């Protein structure tokens, strides 16, 4: 990503290489008033020519940083220190700044806003403005969404062995004990996970439940675990 700096100010951002014109000034043409004042200035004829230098897009790849700077093109250094996980935070747009010393252009995010842990509902004002019905869900909260994901995972895990339960309920072979134990363990684990989610004090605590870390921080080959835990292994 690059910025065009003119008169110590950023005038344009380039997200990708593109053909550019530096120092562009549009051509001007004589008007009827010009012609009335001087008959030699015929309306519609060229008054001042177009100005500027055209450059092909490949200069962004072929030129050195110094060569690009010489025509006002600066490579942008992005500061991601305020960038948060978009699953849990609403990030700001990037603010670009030209720094006269040391003659660089940087881009930085502002302070991210944590998303709501609970459902956000439409208000009476929202309803009067035609945005939605008061009391209905406007935006799903992080906790309800996470718990929904957990319950869906539990449903998917149990689904493949539901036929064992149905067969037993209709007078067929009893469900093998290891499967009965496992299915109960899945439901118990789902409830435990949902309780952990409910108990998260804030967004960072919620995110931490799902974050995997090495059991030995100094050994990147060591197993990874997360506070939320894992589903029980299915019987073989």
Residue ranges and their predicted role:
Residues 1-159, 191-236:
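Interaction-interface detector
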Residues 143, 147, 168-175, 179:
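Short capping loops/turns at secondary-structure boundaries
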Residues 160, 175-176, 180, 219:
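Helix-centric, low-specificity signal for extended rod-like, repetitive segments
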Residues 161-172, 193:
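Secondary-structure edge/capping motif, primarily at the C-terminal ends of alpha-helices
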Residues 176-184, 207-209:
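Short, charged, amphipathic alpha-helical segments
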